[in-house]
């Protein structure tokens, strides 16, 4: 499924109903006092996170959301009925931003999270509130308040455990196909992945994690080059990054905009610079190196090339030599990832118990 991860919507809460000017009219009570009721409150607009929704695509077609207006007050001190709230359902992981102020209003990270984005107006006061010793028959009532209106930007950050990053054509889509049931488009040219893809990796029964295939990054990505920063945000919520590198760039024909002439080590350094420019915290995340396309070389050549790259980078974190296309060496990575998450959970539990 193509994942639309940005949308702008206009939300308008309901206006409050007007207060009523009314007087008590009953038999044998010819001069009844004021009894105009208050108007009902306008409906509010809420955004609710739902785990069964995984895209913002519906907001491409419907961008305006209005809550119901409150009903006017009536005689006999009857209050107007409040307007119904408007509920907007979004995927878990949606960030809501006020376009006018660029302020983050809320971050919906759990199923069922609710966020008030536009509050309904208060109902107007009926004339029963304006009776006094000098004005026993007031003909004064107030109108309902206007509901809030906001232009909002919705951003969807994938809630994935593992993020795949690398240059275009490094083999990220091929890897996610190899280890999960996801079926992203795969072809021999850059920018095949135009939208993030999610896959669930099942290591054992009831033991799995979510992996995200994010479109390839190139130099200048933090400034919007290539597919820009709109996909870098998806890496912010991952717990582990797998950095894929094509170890045989000289054997691949990438075409314009690709990575011709860029050594594997320089590919790693380039992406590290882009991550630091976009969000330095990303470089603090655990990151493992996955040297891909070993099938394009003889085994001893691939191993020697991999060791040279690791030495050139001074890489100290875990690294792997794989062929995503042939699924050679991919499953051991997934087992190690699962074990890494198990250790993380144990450490977090110990820290909570100690605290």
From Swiss-Prot:
Residues 160-342 form the OBG-type G domain. PANTHER family: DEVELOPMENTALLY REGULATED GTP-BINDING PROTEIN-RELATED, MITOCHONDRIAL RIBOSOME-ASSOCIATED GTPASE 2. It comes from the Bacteria. InterPro entries: G_OBG (IPR031167), GTP-bd (IPR006073), GTP-bd_Obg/CgtA (IPR014100), GTP1-OBG_CS (IPR006074), GTP1_OBG_dom (IPR006169), GTP1_OBG_dom_sf (IPR036726), OBG_GTPase (IPR045086), P-loop_NTPase (IPR027417). Monomer. GO terms for biological process: ribosome biogenesis. Belongs to the TRAFAC class OBG-HflX-like GTPase superfamily. OBG GTPase family. This is GTPase Obg. It is found in: Cytoplasm. Residues 1-159 form the Obg domain. The keyword Phosphoprotein does not apply. Its EC number is 3.6.5.-. An essential GTPase which binds GTP, GDP and possibly (p)ppGpp with moderate affinity, with high nucleotide exchange rates and a fairly low GTP hydrolysis rate. Plays a role in control of the cell cycle, stress response, ribosome biogenesis and in those bacteria that undergo differentiation, in morphogenesis control. Keywords: Cytoplasm, GTP-binding, Hydrolase, Magnesium, Metal-binding, Nucleotide-binding. Mg(2+) binds at residues 173, 193. GTP binds at residues 166-173, 191-195, 213-216, 292-295, 323-325.
């Amino acid at each position: 499924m193509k994942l639309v991860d940005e949308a702008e919507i206009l939300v308008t809460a309901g206006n409050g109903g007007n207060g009523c000017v009314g007087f008590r009219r009953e038999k044998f009570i010819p001069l009844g006092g004021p009894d105009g009721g208050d108007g009902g409150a306008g409906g509010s607009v809420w955004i609710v996170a739902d785990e069964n929704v995984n895209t913002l695509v519906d907001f491409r077609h419907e961008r305006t959301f209005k809550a119901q207006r409150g009903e006017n007050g009536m005689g006999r001190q009857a209050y107007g009925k409040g307007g119904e709230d408007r509920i907007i359902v979004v995927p878990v992981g949606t960030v809501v931003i006020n376009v006018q102020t660029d302020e983050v209003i809320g971050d919906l990270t759990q199923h069922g999270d609710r966020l008030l984005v536009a509050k309904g107006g208060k109902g107007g006061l009926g004339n029963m509130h304006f009776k006094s010793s000098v004005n026993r028959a007031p003909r004064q009532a107030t109108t309902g308040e206007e509901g809030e209106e906001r232009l909002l930007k919705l951003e969807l950050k994938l809630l994935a455990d593992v993020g795949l990053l690398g240059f275009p054509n490094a083999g990220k889509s091929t890897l996610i196909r190899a280890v999960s049931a996801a079926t992203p488009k795969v072809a021999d040219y850059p920018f095949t992945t135009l939208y993030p893809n999610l896959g669930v990796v099942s290591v054992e029964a009831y033991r799995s994690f979510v992996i995200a295939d994010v479109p390839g990054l190139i130099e200048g990505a933090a400034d919007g080059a290539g597919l820009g920063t709109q996909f870098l945000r998806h890496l912010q919520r991952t717990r582990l990054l797998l950095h894929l590198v094509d170890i045989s760039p000289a054997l691949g024909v990438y075409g314009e905009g690709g990575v011709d002439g860029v050594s594997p080590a320089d590919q790693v350094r380039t992406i590290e610079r882009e991550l630091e420019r976009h969000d330095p915290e990303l470089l603090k995340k655990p990151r493992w190196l996955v040297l891909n396309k070993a099938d394009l070389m003889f085994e001893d050549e691939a191993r020697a090339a991999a060791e040279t790259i690791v030495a050139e980078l001074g890489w100290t974190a875990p690294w792997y030599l794989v062929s995503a296309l042939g699924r050679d060496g991919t499953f051991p990575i997934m087992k190690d990832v699962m074990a890494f998450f198990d250790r993380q959970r144990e450490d977090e539990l110990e820290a909570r118990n100690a605290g």
